[in-house]
């Protein structure tokens, strides 16, 4: 079975082609550099980028997979959550392709794609705990099967990737700021140590975001030199430690010793290090599948319907 999958939930335009659970091609187009002047996502602009890029991505995916359109058996697309305008572009494109090819068109939850992404091209190991940490969400799930995914906790305000970008911007880093925070991280300089909230509470990142933005803005107002390494390292360590504490709580609560990590924050080196200390079995997606991509949407479709 050949699956054409489409992902347009935020600013990445992605088209993939799979043969069952095997990825034949996955094209990702992103115009994030053009968003630098705005310091982040502008929904109307990224929706327009999707319109400009989606046919190009499809053409490249077909070329790379050596598959023709008339061989496609199913079309899968991201339908939620995400930016409404971006999702709309992907949905209309997917439904148009499915209608033209006379095949079934199936909506897939973007988060479920991230949850299953560590197992792309392989077989999931159920049950497992899943953390999705990205610019749009920060949630922990108990995954019993591809069709039995239970949300244990989520962020009540900002997502971790979102505060990475906002604090990173204040430190002078381009969007997305996560890679720069990771690059300049020095644990010996992480000397700013706010207290942690009760572990049973839902995630909340707005308070820590505001605390570090206040530190940065205070230095700017006093014309003091901003110690980007100390502030960035302290901010990153606190944010990651907050997640690790929450994971430990649910690990003990449900006696699950396998964890899967999805979303862009999975690329962070300090985070990977701490995860390996906590869980005996951990899975992260390949780097090319750790951010938004259509391969995970096609793979999620396959797992839910095999």
From Swiss-Prot:
Quote the record's binding site residues for Fe cation: 110, 114, 292
Task: Name the domain of life.
Answer: Bacteria
What does the cofactor section's free text say about binding?
Binds 1 Fe(2+) ion per subunit.
Protein family membership: Belongs to the KAE1 / TsaD family.
Write down what this protein is called. Answer: tRNA N6-adenosine threonylcarbamoyltransferase
This chain's source organism reads Malacoplasma penetrans (strain HF-2) (Mycoplasma penetrans)
List residues binding substrate: 132-136, 165, 178, 182, 268
The function of this protein is: Required for the formation of a threonylcarbamoyl group on adenosine at position 37 (t(6)A37) in tRNAs that read codons beginning with adenine. Is involved in the transfer of the threonylcarbamoyl moiety of threonylcarbamoyl-AMP (TC-AMP) to the N6 group of A37, together with TsaE and TsaB. TsaD likely plays a direct catalytic role in this reaction.
Chief location: cytoplasm
* GO biological process terms on file: tRNA threonylcarbamoyladenosine modification
Cofactor(s) needed, names only, are: Fe(2+)
Cell membrane keyword on record = no
User: What gene does the UniProt entry assign to this protein?
Assistant: tsaD
Which reactions is this enzyme annotated as catalysing? L-threonylcarbamoyladenylate + adenosine(37) in tRNA = N(6)-L-threonylcarbamoyladenosine(37) in tRNA + AMP + H(+)
Q: Which UniProt keywords apply?
A: Acyltransferase, Cytoplasm, Iron, Metal-binding, Transferase, tRNA processing
Cell location: Cytoplasm
Pfam annotation, one family: TsaD
Got a GO cellular component term for this one?
Answer: cytoplasm
Entry's Gene Ontology molecular function annotations: iron ion binding; N(6)-L-threonylcarbamoyladenine synthase activity
Record EC number: 2.3.1.234
């Amino acid at each position: 079975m050949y699956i054409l999958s489409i992902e347009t939930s935020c600013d990445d335009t992605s088209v993939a082609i799979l043969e069952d659970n095997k990825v034949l091609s996955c094209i990702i187009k992103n115009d994030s550099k053009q968003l630098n002047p705005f310091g982040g996502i502008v929904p109307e602009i990224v929706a327009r980028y999707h319109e400009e890029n989606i046919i190009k991505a499809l053409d490249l995916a077909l070329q790379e997979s050596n598959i023709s359109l008339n061989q496609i058996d199913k079309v899968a697309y991201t339908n939620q959550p995400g930016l409404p305008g971006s999702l709309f572009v992907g949905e209309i494109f997917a439904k148009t392709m499915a209608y033209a090819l006379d095949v079934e068109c199936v909506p897939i939850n973007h988060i479920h794609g991230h949850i299953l992404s560590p197992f792309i091209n392989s077989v999931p190991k159920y049950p497992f705990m899943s953390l999705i940490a990205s610019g749009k969400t920060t949630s922990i799930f108990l995954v019993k099967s591809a069709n039995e995914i239970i949300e244990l906790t989520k962020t009540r305000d900002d997502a971790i990737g979102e505060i990475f970008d906002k604090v990173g911007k204040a430190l002078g880093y381009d969007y997305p700021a996560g890679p720069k925070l990771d690059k300049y991280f020095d644990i010996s300089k992480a000397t700013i140590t706010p207290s942690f909230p009760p572990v049973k509470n839902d995630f909340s990142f707005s308070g820590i975001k505001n605390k570090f933005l206040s530190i940065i803005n205070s230095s700017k107002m006093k014309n003091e030199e901003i110690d980007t390494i100390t502030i960035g390292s302290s901010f990153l360590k606190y944010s990651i430690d907050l997640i690790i504490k929450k994971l430990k709580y649910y690990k003990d609560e449900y006696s699950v010793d396998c964890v899967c990590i999805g979303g862009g924050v999975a690329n962070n080196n300090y985070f990977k290090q701490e995860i390996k200390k906590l869980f005996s079995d951990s899975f992260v997606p390949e780097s090319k599948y750790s951010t938004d991509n259509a391969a995970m949407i096609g793979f999620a479709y396959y797992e839910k319907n095999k």
